[in-house]
């Protein structure tokens, strides 16, 4: 929900700076709402006890016993796009392909095909995804849960995290090296409204707290 709220505030700012119509609002908000639906098991017609659909060819991934929805992290973007194409294609006022293309931009690290120059809409959905997560006032408190989600698919090792404390210790570096460049256009739109500036303040507050190693706001360090 925070991602959708961030997307809405980005659109509010954009509307004050450039032409933004009802269709723009609808497609971006719907993309924000459905961008992570692929984590949910059983949403696609081919999902079954034998495995979960992971691509348009119908290939499946069988999850180990005891897995959570987080185990679908490597596939969730493709699953979200498949869900959108299946469920939204019959809605006249929405272009399912447009929504799916915007969701593609939420793949992280960004896919090579997701060129910011081709789709401002996709870039703003990506920014809403990042800002909604990292601008959460409780983001650092959620570090333990996030770490174990990463651990379930081995991503903690890829990112160099050996414990939840590493996630917060390395957060400022991660933000400036991997996040900041992808959200600058959205920051420009957020800076136009008071609610948008609150998102910016939240982002920098989390960086400040991680840098200062404030107690009681995240994993024991």
What are these regions (language model features)?
Residues 9-24, 34, 38-45, 88-93, ...:
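Divalent metal-dependent phosphate-bond-processing catalytic cores, especially two-metal-ion Mg2+/Mn2+ enzymes
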Residues 10-13, 56-64, 79, 122:
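Alpha-helical context
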Residues 7, 70-111:
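Histidine- and acidic-residue-rich, metal-dependent catalytic cores
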Residues 15, 58-72, 84:
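Short acidic, glycine/Ser/Thr-rich loop/turn "cap" segments at secondary-structure junctions
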Residues 27-31:
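Active-site alpha-helix of zinc metalloproteases
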Residues 43-67:
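Post-HEXXH active-site segment of zinc metalloproteases
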């Amino acid at each position: 929900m925070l991602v959708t709220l961030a997307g809405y505030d980005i659109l509010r700012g954009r509307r004050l700076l450039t032409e933004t119509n009802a269709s723009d609002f609808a497609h971006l908000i719907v993309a924000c709402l459905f961008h992570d639906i692929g984590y949910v098991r059983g949403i696609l017609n081919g999902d079954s006890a034998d495995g979960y659909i992971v691509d348009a060819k119908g290939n499946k991934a069988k999850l180990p016993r005891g897995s959570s929805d987080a185990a679908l992290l490597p596939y969730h973007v493709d699953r979200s796009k498949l869900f959108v194409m299946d469920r939204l294609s019959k809605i006249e006022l929405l272009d399912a392909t447009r929504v799916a293309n915007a969701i593609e931009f939420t793949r992280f690290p960004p896919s090579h095909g997701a060129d910011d120059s081709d789709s401002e809409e996709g870039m703003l959905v990506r920014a809403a995804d990042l800002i909604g997560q990292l601008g959460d006032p409780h983001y650092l408190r959620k570090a333990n849960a996030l770490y174990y989600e990463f651990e379930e698919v081995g991503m903690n090792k890829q990112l160099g995290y050996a414990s939840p404390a590493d996630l917060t210790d390395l957060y400022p570096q991660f933000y400036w090296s991997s996040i900041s460049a992808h959200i600058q256009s959205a920051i420009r739109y957020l800076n136009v409204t008071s609610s948008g500036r609150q998102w910016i303040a939240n982002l920098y507050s989390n960086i400040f707290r991680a840098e200062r190693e404030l107690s009681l706001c995240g994993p024991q360090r």
